[in-house]
Amino acid sequence: MLIFLEVKYMNFHNRKLDEELIDYNISLRILFTILSVAIIMVAFDSLGSSVSDPVGDALCKLIKVFRGNTAKGIAVVGIIVLGIQTLRGKLQWEVALVVVTAIIILFKAPDIVNMVSSDNNSSSCGVS
């Protein structure tokens, strides 16, 4: 009888830990989403910044890195890794969708913003 109670308690304890981990993961996802949106908003606000704005200049340099040759190299490596995984039969479609979506967002975000916004001013920040 004592062994049965210990096993039952251990299962309850494991279930409680799993629920806490799920709650922790959800809170991290929400935090990551909020921070990502905040960074994107700050970056796009800095696109039309003046020359004397040091924060805007730093964000423009960051955008140039993320849209320049470094980003193109990382995208090529990501596609090569997906190709190798496909040839080995180990491709997970979730990973492939995340990589392809990230590449599309990275390189097409300014076009999407220009399409949605009615502002015709072209920014001097970023790589075209």
From Swiss-Prot:
Species per Swiss-Prot/TrEMBL record: Rickettsia prowazekii (strain Madrid E)
Lineage, top ranks: Bacteria, Pseudomonadati, Pseudomonadota, Alphaproteobacteria, Rickettsiales
Transmembrane segments annotated in the record for this chain: 30-50, 65-85, 93-113
Predominant cellular place of this UniProt entry's protein: membrane
Compartment list: Cell membrane
InterPro entries: TrbC/VirB2 (IPR007039)
One GO CC term on file: plasma membrane
Protein name as annotated: Uncharacterized protein RP192
Domain of life of the native organism: Bacteria
Pfam families, per the entry: TrbC
Keywords: Cell membrane, Membrane, Transmembrane, Transmembrane helix
Membrane topology of this protein: Multi-pass membrane protein
